[in-house]
Amino acid sequence: MTEHAPPRRPRRARRRRIVLVAALAGALLGGYALGSAKAAPIGHWRSTEGRAAYLEAYDTAFADLPEPADTHDVRTDYGVVRVYRFAGDGDAELPLVLLPGTASGMPVLADNLPSLLEVGDVYAMDLLGEPGRSIQDRPITSDADKAAWLHQALEALPEDRFHLLGLSIGGWTATNLALHHDEHLASLITLDAIQTYDDIPLGTVARSIPAAFPWMPKAWRDSFSSYTAGGASVEDVPVATMIESGMQNYRMAQPQPTRITPEQLATLEQPVLAILAGRSVMHDPEEAAATARSTLSDARVEVFPDASHAINGEYPEEIAALVDDFTTEVEAR
């Protein structure tokens, strides 16, 4: 296991770090539960006006991304998955596929794309059954269903193998795919994945409750988001506006992600790069690192001691350097 000394970050980094957190904290701990209990069988927008407001915010945030080379709407048995391809400048033989955190949409990865494109070509998708431009049209009722739609989306892409990188719940989604359908996975990269190497602490669950309801004051969600981002203040940036709109206007209708067990982790055969935030409140970082180290048969575990759960916005260049080194080593085997 490697620990990384935190570099000094400019103020812009502290603006960035909060935008991930709202997507994965209040939405994960509240949105899934509310959606499963009361929503229609599929995820849906609460109103036409809410959908329009979200898509306007999505497009504004998307404008900060590099221009995609291609846009795919991939039909699966569970709905249509929006996938973007970005042409990279690096030497990687296989493309990266990026999975965002919950309730965010793929523009949450805006800070990561420039440095990851120096590794190679990148695909990024909106998770099915979540706010974004993917459209769910069949119930997703199990972990197997969650793996099935992602497997079908990858099968529709022209390449045969990929390095799959998941952020927060995207890390769980990537690992869940590896447990059910690993045919197209050259490697697995998890970025402070939740429900994967440790449970969500009860204290975090309790603190999330006021943020879980869309009719509660925005200040309550901001307070919880600041807590998960290590105390960083919430600022109005395009991605944060998109996330807030998604939490307000979209109702998810699928079960919460099941904790992946150590026994399941031990069955994974792909090389795994597990990147963990040392100050994450979404699991016990030491316990998570120990689990990854003791269960994964082919793993590299990297811990950033001063990173919060919003690690993707705090350390984008450092993460890309690790990904570059890891994928280069995997492809050289």
Stretch-by-stretch model annotation:
Residues 2-94, 119-120, 328-333:
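Alpha/beta-hydrolase fold catalytic core
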Residues 54, 82-132:
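Conserved HGGG/HGGXW glycine-rich cap/lid loop of the alpha/beta-hydrolase fold
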Residues 124-165:
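Active-site loop/oxyanion-hole signature of alpha/beta-hydrolase fold enzymes
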Residues 166, 170, 174:
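Gly/Ala-rich beta-loop-alpha elbow adjacent to hydrolase catalytic centers
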Residues 175-179, 187-215:
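Flexible "cap/lid" loop of the alpha/beta hydrolase fold
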Residues 199-205, 213-269:
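Conserved alpha/beta-hydrolase catalytic His-Asp/Glu region
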Residues 273-307:
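Conserved loop-alpha-helix segment in the C-terminal half of the alpha/beta-hydrolase fold
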Residues 299-333:
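Catalytic active-site module of serine/aspartate enzymes centered on a nucleophile-bearing elbow/loop
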